[in-house]
Design a protein with these regions (language model features):
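Glycine-rich phosphate/dinucleotide-binding loop and adjoining beta-alpha-beta core of small-molecule
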Residues: 184
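Hydrophobic alpha-helical transmembrane segments
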Residues: 1-175, 179, 187-319
């Protein structure tokens, strides 16, 4: 029952507190470790495709395994001192592995700036949560970027860590976060990371394969619960879920596009380079700032569905 209560408590902590700036966050430490490992390995290994592949593979092995070992040992030691301490640590880390409240807050900030008509401020706000270049985005482009981020991060920021913590508590959830953080920092297909980031990207693809598909199905159900188009979500997901270079990224994006009746994705600039990405969904209407709020409601609805279903399954397996 430890994992049951840790997951429930962690979910409630995230819903109530999000990620307070005064509380050290494991992902920040992971990012520092990735940067340090990258710097050391790039210096130590030959600057060739083979050398960069080897360096990237080393990071992709050391960080997840190290995270699992350190967090697992910490949870074990805390539980040995007192069961309540072990549970509290697991709750804290489970809460920090989830990003529902933070995602909703950041995307709502984008909506607020758009609602005020302050496009430069909206661009700055959306730049906090997307990887693309934002300085030349129109209001529709800013809205589209925010909606896409809510949809995609509903999978890797909520559903995936929730699934892994249900399977293995906080240590497994944070191990997943280590993999996801590696991908966000190294998994680019540009000159700098084409080889060094390849293992991180492939490992992230594998870790997200099942969660992203579960998240898409839950999004269809969430669309029905929130008054959006479940039929559209199902239809566009079935049609467009593979319209992305990543096997996972278009899963929830396509369901979201169909639920809202808008078109997402399409060409974008990353670090000054133009990427001709395919569009997802049909433009049944023009996207509007309130679609950010609609996407948030569906994200919260699918999060609650995942929690209830996951805890129910966990309870049945324990009893």
């Amino acid at each position: 029952m430890l994992i049951f209560w840790a997951v429930l408590g962690g979910f409630l902590l995230d819903a109530l507190l999000g990620d307070p700036t005064w509380l050290p966050h494991p992902v920040v430490l992971m990012g520092r470790c990735i940067s340090a490992l990258e710097k050391h390995l790039r210096t130590a290994l030959p600057k060739t495709p083979r050398g960069e592949l080897a360096g990237g593979a080393a990071v992709a092995a050391v960080l997840p395994l190290g995270t699992l070992a350190v967090t697992g040992l910490a949870c074990w030691a805390a539980a040995r001192l007192h069961p309540a301490l072990g549970l509290a640590l697991q709750m804290l880390w489970c809460g920090q592995a989830l990003a529902a409240k933070g995602l909703a807050q950041e995307s709502r900030n984008v909506y607020k700036e758009l609602a005020k008509g302050d496009l430069p401020a909206a661009r700055r706000a959306v730049a906090r949560i997307v990887g693309r270049d934002t300085q030349n985005l129109t209001a529709a482009g800013v809205t589209r970027a925010a909606v896409e981020t809510v949809a995609e991060n509903a999978s890797d920021g909520v559903i995936a860590p929730l699934l892994y913590m249900l399977l293995g508590g906080a240590p497994l959830a944070l191990t997943y976060k280590a993999i996801n953080t590696m991908d966000s920092m190294l998994g680019y297909k540009n000159g700098k990371y084409l080889y060094f980031g390849r293992c991180a990207a492939k490992l992230d693809d594998a870790a997200n394969w099942l969660p992203s598909r579960l998240a898409a199905l839950l999004w269809v159900a969430a669309a029905a619960l929130t008054g959006n188009s479940a039929r559209g979500a199902w239809r566009i997901w079935r049609r467009d879920r593979r319209r992305h270079a990543s096997p996972n990224s278009a899963q929830t994006e396509s369901a979201c596009a169909g639920a809202l009746g808008v078109q997402l994705a399409g060409p974008a600039y990353y670090f000054g380079e133009y990427y001709d990405k395919p569009t997802i969904g049909d433009p049944l209407r023009e996207i509007e700032p309130r679609d950010i709020l609609r996407a948030n409601r569906m994200m919260y609805a699918e999060s609650l569905l995942a929690l209830v279903l996951g805890l129910a399954v966990r309870l049945m397996l324990v009893l």
